[in-house]
Amino acid sequence: MADDIHKKRWGKASVGALIVMIILSSVGSAYANKKEELVPAVSVPAKDQMVSIDINKVNDGHLHRFAYRTKKGTQVRFIVVLKGGSAYGVGLDCCEICGPTGYIEREGQIVCKLCDVVMNKQTIGLPGGCNPIPVKYGVGNGQIRIEQKELDAAAKYFR
């Protein structure tokens, strides 16, 4: 009789452990296969050979994605993020290592969508590694200004 009770307990414990393993593997699988989508880029036109972005639209410290369409029809995506104070990080939405897969913002951090590397915001706008390819820009009259020729030259990364 004691032996039967002991076997029932082991049986129930085994079934319980199996249920817990199934639940954990299902949750883990769902988390691992979760696809994070890029926020759509805001289309920006060139005017007088310059692409301008209102600083008030990008001064919240979050990642902002923009797209400029070249005369040949290539969409050149670039990102802008406030690094702190009045310093901005401006770069292409691609890198030399992973290509034009883009970046996402996850829990306040900028992350490469392909290799999942977390970027230090202070290095955005600097070359190297998986950092966004830098874009030359200027700030004036409440605008971030990028020369059209700079974005036209960057089209080679998005073909």
Positions of predicted regions on the chain:
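Short cysteine/histidine-rich metal-coordination sites, predominantly Zn2+-binding motifs
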Residues: 108-118, 126-136
